[in-house]
UniProtKB/Swiss-Prot annotation:
Transfers an acetyl group from acetyl-CoA to L-homoserine, forming acetyl-L-homoserine. Belongs to the MetA family. This is Homoserine O-acetyltransferase. It comes from the Bacteria. Substrate binds at residues 163, 192, 249. It comes from Bacillus cereus (strain ZK / E33L). The record marks 111 as: Important for acyl-CoA specificity. The keyword Glycosyltransferase does not apply. One of its GO terms (cellular component) is cytoplasm.
Amino acid sequence: MPIIIDKDLPARKVLQEENIFVMTKERAETQDIRALKIAILNLMPTKQETEAQLLRLIGNTPLQLDVHLLHMESHLSRNVAQEHLTSFYKTFRDIENEKFDGLIITGAPVETLSFEEVDYWEELKRIMEYSKTNVTSTLHICWGAQAGLYHHYGVQKYPLKEKMFGVFEHEVREQHVKLLQGFDELFFAPHSRHTEVRENDIRGVKELTLLANSEEAGVHLVIGPEGRQVFALGHSEYSCDTLKQEYERDRQKGLNIDVPKNYFKHDNPNEKPLVRWRSHGNLLFSNWLNYYVYQETPYVL
């Protein structure tokens, strides 16, 4: 089933070339089925790339989705044209009186700061509070997951000696949770972060359930009561070349960055990346949409 997006959104052309079913708002309004309202709070500086990554995954489901892109009003985005934000994005103030079936909060390259040092932290706290009563289920990704765990449950993040960077094997810890329906017992997911949350801290919060972790990369998937909050510390939405682009960017900046682990063939950056997370990435997003959004949301929001 299609996702509904603005006909002029640049990501539309990318998605259509990949045979992802997208639909214009004009066409969708002629149908009698209610689309699921999904908001994406895009905290990444590479907004258009992140749009395509997430729309690619949520568009690969048998559900019609009405997607609303959000950006932070209290933060000046320097890596995206203001025209793009004006044309395709809303702020929290624009939608705070609405209800949504689902919300995705992305990662952000601010993890070395304390949460309170992030210039939009107060606005993000208001959005996370709003999500508790106005959103059926919220999916938090990477730093967005760390922020959600900290705000809702007081779970701290800790600096790593070296960046967790690469594609890592994870083990399913809870076999009978719908979010992991169809998952293999072992699966891969990318990570790209300088901080971590710790398993003992997660297990110390009775409302949280650890679903999957990695011996090397640590905590990956965590779920709150009734699936109202889902936390993914990795980046299952990443495209094939995202880690490569990050690696090359950091090298160009002169940073001391290791080759992403388990990513390039033979761990050689001159060779092609090996994609081993795509199927489980699709499964993660489709399970979230099906079991925690579509199956749980009321017809009238």
